[in-house]
């Protein structure tokens, strides 16, 4: 065993006093002890601070790594959601074209109930996917998007039957983005019924019982030809069988030298010659009385031909009494106090006799000229 060295404190004299190093006695000793104790406490505090800073740095580094992990997970989920939605749209198109869609896998983590929400930051692409349903705080699940498409299908089942403002023919093919559900897929040659025209150039129309938007630059407006108004044929009361010109008519009666005179004074058709009188011929400086007589007789013959044609076309039978004229003829004849006048006593009968005499005279004159 180790032996303890004996202390020499007992060897000192009891009456011997301790030596003072200063005038303050043992004060310096207590001061040195207090200083050493305070130094020790400072060192301990510094150690605690360093340990705390190390722990904080460890916790901060662990928190930063956790934030990176969360961001990586959110980015991965965004990509998965986008791929899933594109796949759903492609399968929907296949169903519309009659092909069978591929079933979803049971292991797909994106298929869930309507209550599942993913607290991720919304991106611009996802905003366009759900057309305003996603917010900055979160994005709805794919099941919500499919329910929205189902509602669109219900709207498509009831086609638009309202008024249209025109039709347009497509001259350029256009296939909208799969995210754009409001635009029409158009092909060259399609006929679109226009519902609304906006000044921005995006029109609304219906194609194959589907209402949607399309740009006016892809179509040509069809101008509907207005139905031509039906021509109302007015029955002419005066119609002749032989359609001749004044020149031919005057050549037939050997008076072609008066063609220019008559044309310059407004006698352009044969109808104008029917009402000509001898005073009119004198005003036209036709001085030869024989020429005037021949022209008047020819005009009267035209009038007689027209009256015979009208009589043939009349469907109203005459009365049993041949002496009494029809009502239409009586309107043209002068009458006194409403009394009917027979054809024997009328002025028309006298004019007919005079016309016959004039025609005989014209024939005699023509015979004499030919004999000469």
Swiss-Prot record:
Induction: Up-regulated in peripheral blood B-cells by IL4 and bacterial lipopolysaccharide (LPS).
Oligomer and partners: Interacts with FASLG. Interacts with phosphotyrosine containing proteins. Interacts (via SH3 domain) with CTTN. Interacts (phosphorylated at Ser-23) with YWHAB, YWHAE, YWHAG, YWHAH, YWHAZ and SFN. Interacts directly with SAP30 and HDAC1. Identified in a complex with SAP30 and HDAC1.
Residue stretches of biased makeup (Polar residues): 317-329
Gene: Samsn1
Family annotation (Pfam families): SAM_2 (PF07647), SH3_2 (PF07653), SPIDER (PF12485)
Protein name as it appears in the record: SAM domain-containing protein SAMSN-1
MF annotations from Gene Ontology: phosphotyrosine residue binding
Domain SH3, residue spans: 163-224
List of residues that carry Phosphotyrosine: 160
Location of the protein in the cell: Nucleus; Cytoplasm; Cell projection, Ruffle
Residues bearing PTM Phosphothreonine: 76
Protein species of origin: Mus musculus (Mouse)
Modified residues (Phosphoserine): 23, 34, 74, 90, 97, 119
Disruption phenotype: No visible phenotype. Mice have normal bone marrow B-cell development and normal splenic T- and B-cell populations, but show an enhanced immune response upon immunization. Mice have constitutively activated Lyn, due to constitutive Lyn tyrosine phosphorylation.
Lineage of the organism: Eukaryota, Metazoa, Chordata, Craniata, Vertebrata
Short sequence motif Important for interaction with 14-3-3 proteins: positions: 20-25
């Amino acid at each position: 065993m180790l032996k303890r060295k004996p202390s020499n404190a007992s060897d000192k004299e009891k009456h011997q006093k301790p030596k003072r190093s200063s005038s303050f006695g043992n004060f310096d000793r207590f001061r040195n002890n207090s200083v050493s104790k305070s130094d020790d406490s400072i060192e301990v505090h510094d150690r605690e601070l360093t340990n705390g800073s190390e722990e904080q740095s460890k916790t901060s580094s662990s928190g930063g790594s956790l934030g990176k992990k969360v961001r990586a997970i959110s980015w991965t989920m965004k990509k998965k959601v986008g791929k899933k939605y594109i796949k759903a749209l492609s399968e929907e198109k296949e169903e519309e074209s009659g092909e069978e869609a591929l079933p979803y896998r049971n292991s797909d983590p994106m298929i869930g109930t309507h209550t599942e929400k993913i607290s991720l930051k919304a991106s611009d692409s996802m905003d366009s996917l759900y057309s305003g349903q996603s917010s900055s705080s979160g994005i709805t699940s794919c099941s919500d998007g499919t329910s929205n498409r189902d509602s669109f299908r219900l709207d498509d089942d009831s086609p638009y039957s309202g008024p249209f403002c025109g039709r347009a023919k497509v001259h350029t093919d256009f296939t909208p983005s799969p995210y754009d559900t409001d635009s029409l897929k158009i092909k060259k040659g399609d006929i679109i019924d226009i519902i609304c025209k906006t000044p921005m150039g995006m029109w609304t129309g219906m194609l194959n019982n589907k209402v949607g938007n399309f740009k006016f630059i892809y179509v040509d407006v069809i101008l509907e030809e207005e139905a031509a108004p039906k021509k109302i044929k007015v029955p002419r009361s005066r119609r002749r069988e032989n359609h001749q010109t004044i020149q031919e008519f005057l050549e037939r009666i050997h008076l072609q030298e008066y063609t220019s005179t008559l044309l310059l004074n407004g006698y352009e058709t044969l109808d104008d010659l029917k009402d000509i009188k001898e005073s009119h011929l004198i005003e036209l400086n036709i001085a030869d009385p024989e020429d005037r007589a021949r022209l008047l007789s020819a005009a009267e013959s035209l009038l007689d031909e027209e009256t015979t044609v009208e009589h043939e076309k009349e469907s109203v039978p005459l009365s049993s009494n041949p002496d009494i004229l029809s009502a239409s003829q009586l309107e043209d004849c002068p009458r006194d106090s409403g009394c009917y006048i027979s054809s024997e006593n009328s002025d028309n009968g006298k004019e007919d006799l005079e016309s016959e005499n004039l025609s005989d005279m014209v024939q005699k004159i023509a015979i004499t000229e030919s004999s000469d």
